[in-house]
């Protein structure tokens, strides 16, 4: 056996076992320590070249230089819109949700005031530094509301108005480090890509984490099993929400010890978390004494304070932090999102307004589409009401409106481009009630379009 070992050679350089310090065996192959060192040198050179190309990239140079304090912040304090101005802009884009819009306006205004305050403190002369200067901490925001109530739209509208980098992340794809799925640092990579890889600009942006309720702890007992997509993700997000220097892989994916990472300071990034939190109303009502377990008697019902009884749609207005803990969010996570805005469930009247009032309302969108075919589209007020009623029945919020109108307009959008003699079209309530079973009657050129509605 010893004679056989003496003839072992490196499969790469062909040196025998006696000529090298170490010979590592694999499945049918061998490699010596010298070849391993050579491979490491090759990998290091490749990493250096990659980093040099990244630093010289035109995308990085397109934005403002990082080392210039006068231009590193997108705007000065004097140009930041006041909360009333922010809410006015939100009113033009989002219908309803007055309380949530007011909370967002104040929170965003204070956030950028804090950024400007920090910039002024950093630019002070070293001789005049005040060790007792007040440090302003950021306040992340939690949006709670049913699906289709406008959580994502509010965040996107804010980013559009403030003209800062804005990224949307999905919490359902995140897992704890070491498991299949995305690391939490990939959220910052999306913000970097929106900033064209400008770190300084990304550090002043906004990140909206959607479906945050899906990372709630699966059980109230944290010791039952390891929850890598629930509590584990909450633990991983703690430092990022509070403010830390995060290492982000420039190509995404998992971090590798031999790959260079981009460092981002998250203390200046505003995080907005949103979720539907289905079932949270029941937790609030149970705390208020609305529900009881098992059979009840008249004497039991008399013990319930009638003043505390609330409708299920208004239960979230009485939300407390303990309710979120019972839902599955850990206290440390809740403590890093101090601002909480509860969005109202959309009513039929609100859905009608959403169809017609905003700048990008669905009715205006389809009117614009048909105007490109030289057709004037009109909606009867009763038809708008019928569409809103159908959307309210589907219980998916404003998202149901587009689905209904797309279904309503499908046949019309298919036939109208080929009928050049028709110049006007009106959507009626009967068309909606009859599930869009309308027929178009052709008329002589130059006449208006008439809708023949089947019974």
Swiss-Prot record:
Q: What Gene Ontology molecular function terms does this protein carry?
A: ATP binding; ATP hydrolysis activity; ATP-dependent protein folding chaperone; protein dimerization activity; unfolded protein binding; zinc ion binding
Question: Which residues are noted in the entry as Zn(2+)-binding?
Answer: 10, 13, 32, 35
> Which Gene Ontology CC terms are recorded?
HslUV protease complex
InterPro entries to which the protein is assigned, alphabetical: AAA+_ATPase, ATP-dep_Clp_protease_ClpX, ATPase_AAA_core, Clp_ATPase_C, Clp_protease_ATP-bd_su_ClpX, ClpX_bact, P-loop_NTPase, Znf_CppX_C4
- From what superkingdom does this record's organism come? Bacteria
Q: Does the keyword Transmembrane helix apply?
A: no
The record's similarity note reads: Belongs to the ClpX chaperone family.
* Protein's UniProt name: ATP-dependent Clp protease ATP-binding subunit ClpX
Q: Gene behind this chain?
A: clpX
